Regions:
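Beta-alpha-beta core module
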Residues: 94-107, 121, 168-217
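Short, well-ordered beta-strand segments
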Residues: 33-37, 85, 135, 181, ...
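Flexible hinge/capping segments at coil-to-helix
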Residues: 27-28, 98-139
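Central regulatory/effector-binding core of bacterial HTH transcription factors
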Residues: 31-93, 270
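Hydrophobic hinge/microswitch elements
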Residues: 69-73, 78-81, 88, 142-198, ...
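Secondary-structure junction motif
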Residues: 88, 119-123, 131-154, 220-229, ...
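Short amphipathic alpha-helical coupling segments at ligand-binding clamshell hinges
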Residues: 1-8, 46, 50, 146-147, ...
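Alpha-helical "hinge/linker" immediately C-terminal to small N-terminal DNA-binding modules
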Residues: 1-28
Length: 272
């Protein structure tokens, strides 16, 4: 209830400012407002790249970004306090919210480290990661589950020296050499420049997948449309398989457990 009151108050104050500007003869070009929910499993560097195209629309845009858990964001989405939610997993069909998953794209994982670790573990990757110091996302995240499954399939058990809720904090510790760390492949160039790290290896089959979730079957808000179009055509253009492009949008509640990439039964969105 408090968030609803806050949003209405914000709109009232904006209208008040517009009224004052009109009375004083100032231009009143009120920007289009979009409220975006960002699931806390989405790296902030990815979220920024997803949202940025919405700021390049012909008309002015004012964005409000709210980070939170799946439960919080879906509750707000269901009563239209949010225009769209950005998530790293689709909404599960068991969730009693009439919403739709719009696939933005997917990317493999890059394994990075400081030069000392690169020299030690690049040769023979990925089996070289046996007993290597590793920084990991928390075990309840989609990317951690996918990473654990991949390592187990290779019979590789690194030595976990740190677990983090926040991917940016994980990368900060990786930058000081605490351990090998992974990141979405689409961020590799950015992280190499930012942290002066290097690639140890990469795992294109360990996918991080990103979705826009809305109460609409077809996105209508111009900012949400811009986010989806740019993600598919630019950010994830080389990482989105043809099969995913043919089935980008799915109603969440009616999907069966075995249905395609639009939903992951192993990692339902509320648990990610």
């Amino acid at each position: 209830m408090g968030q609803v009151v806050y949003r209405y108050a914000d709109e009232i104050f904006a209208l008040g400012r517009e009224l004052v500007d009109t009375a004083r003869g100032r231009p009143t070009g009120r920007p289009m407002h979009v409220v975006i929910g960002v699931h806390d499993g989405v790296p902030k560097s990815i979220a920024r790249r997803l949202i940025e195209p919405a700021l390049s629309l012909p008309e002015p845009v004012r964005i409000t970004c709210r980070e939170g858990s799946a439960e919080q964001l879906l509750a707000d989405l269901s009563v239209q306090r949010l225009d769209v939610v950005l998530a790293d997993a689709p909404i599960a069909p068991t969730v009693k919210v009439r919403a739709y998953n719009h696939l933005l794209g997917e990317t493999g994982l890059s394994f990075l480290g400081v030069p000392r670790l690169v020299r030690k573990y690049r040769s023979g990757f990925p089996t070289s990661l046996r007993d290597a110091p590793m920084l990991m996302p928390m075990s309840n995240t989609t990317v951690r589950r996918n990473l654990d499954q991949w390592l187990e399939s290779l019979d590789v058990r690194p030595r976990v020296v740190g677990e983090f809720d926040d991917s940016e904090l994980l990368w900060e510790f990786g930058a000081i050499g605490l351990g090998v760390f992974s990141a979405p492949l689409v961020l590799e160039t950015h992280l190499v420049r930012l942290y002066n790290v290097q690639r140890i290896g990469w795992a294109p089959s360990v996918l991080s997948t990103f979705y826009a979730i809305s109460v609409e079957r077809k996105l209508k808000h111009p900012a949400a449309v811009a986010i989806c179009d740019a993600a598919r055509s630019t950010l994830f253009a080389k990482n989105t398989p043809t099969s995913s492009r043919r089935a980008r949008t799915r109603p969440a509640p009616s999907r069966r457990a075995a249905a395609g990439r639009e939903r992951s039964a192993a990692s339902p969105f509320p648990q990610g």
